[in-house]
Amino acid sequence: MRLISKVLVKTNCLEVGMRRAPQWYSHYSTTAGNARVNKKGSKVVPVLTGLALASIFAKKWYDDSQIKKADATSVAVDASISAFPKKMGPPQWPFSTQYELIGKGVRCVSSITFKAYGLGIYVAAEDKHLVSEVLDSKFLSQAFIDTAAPPSPENSHQDNLRTALNDPAKAPILINNLLDSGIRLMSKNTPIKAGSFKLLMDGTKKSVLKNPDSQSQDKDRLEAGFQELHDCFRSVKGLVARDDDFFIELNKDCSMNLSYYARKKDEFVILGTVKEPLIGKLLFAHYLAAVDPPSPEARKEVIDALVSLS
């Protein structure tokens, strides 16, 4: 192990084609001499980013030869892929914070009969309080939610909120206000059919452009953001296997951290960060407020969760 550490240190010092690990990944050391120990006492090789793939040899939570079935800590999305964890975060998963699942469903492409991905939407556990702070605010309640005149005694604020979140005109306003609050979200995209990294990148870009608000945004900023998205995929090429995971973390400033988990290899790859906030905001607003969202089932469950948190 000492010899391996020396080799990793030497590799990590190469500057050509290498990038420093993002700050949000601080709970995993990028210095080979600081390999941490997992619960079983086995060493975890630290992460190398950039053109080198980042491999984490951590405790496996799945059977290599079988799809992980739902249990008390996970929920089924589709029989072709592993169940989605109800909670995801460090130390098992190298994310910036702990996340909780608030919506899941199947994402279809081109035809309702072609199931492409399982989609999960997660919220940062520390940020759940922002839902009520934003959606129960006096301004939004009076202007967009509790607008019946005279007020109906039969409908509660939660009833009115559910109606507003299903309204094509009001939903984008409410969701954009929630995103502006700094709430952290994460999407988990798990291929039901094998695909490619190019498809993942193109699909993310198309989802951004499907948001009608994208048409009124600064084109230069959008193009700069799409270039950052493209740069995140420079280090990975080829096929994406069924049941692998593509993660998009939405930060407080609406920048996005992109990462990929190769399940059979047990490799976690940090793809990079899209700093332009327009991309992250447009993408997650499309997930949560679109008339034709990537997964209507996931959006419905997210609405139910937001109502219950308000």
Curated annotation (Swiss-Prot):
Pfam assignment, any one: Chalcone_2
Record protein name field: Altered inheritance of mitochondria protein 46, mitochondrial
Domain of life: Eukaryota
Gene3D superfamilies, per the entry: 3.50.70.10
InterPro entries noted in UniProt: Chalcone_isomerase, Chalcone_isomerase_3-sand, Chalcone_isomerase_sf
Organism in which the protein naturally occurs: Saccharomyces cerevisiae (strain JAY291)
Transit peptide residue numbers: 1-20
Cellular location(s): Mitochondrion
Transit peptide among keywords: yes
Main subcellular localisation: mitochondrion
GO molecular function: intramolecular lyase activity
GO CC terms in record: mitochondrion
Key words of the record: Mitochondrion, Transit peptide
UniProt similarity note: Belongs to the AIM18/AIM46 family.
Transmembrane segments: none
